[in-house]
Amino acid sequence: DTRNAHKTASGSYLVAHERDGVVREYDAKGSVIWEYAVPLFGRERAGGHSPEAFGNQLYSAVRLPNGNTLIGTGNGHSVIEVTPEKEIVWKLEQNDLDGITLAWVTQVERLPNGNTRLVNCHAGPDNPQIIEVTPAKQVVWTFHDFDTFGNSMPVALVLPAE
């Protein structure tokens, strides 16, 4: 399954292959020019979408201006930033945020101020659906409306106020 694809500034395409647990970058002719397999970090797979599940079924990947790739690891409950050499240089894990549990981390975005915004799907009624964090993993703000959206908010577009 392919969850989403983004065209990069260089004209290639960055594609999140959920079932394979791999981000692949394709050139304009469809040839793979880079790929990154999301690791299991020494853990065993556990099926499902809830916070108790675990795997590497990533949901999203975006290329950052510095050339690194920001990845929403899906049921890996994390956000990772990896270099072109495949080194993890930043990671937000399931229980890094005080009072918040990450579940199926879907859409991710690095904001111009350096903060990271992520969508936290399938996290249950006690956790926010959208979270913005600083590079130091401090929560800036959250959106939490389980009554309206439940566990079914895999993507969100947050626009600036006019």
List PLM regions with ranges.
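Histidine-/acidic-rich catalytic cores in large beta-rich domains
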Residues: 1-162
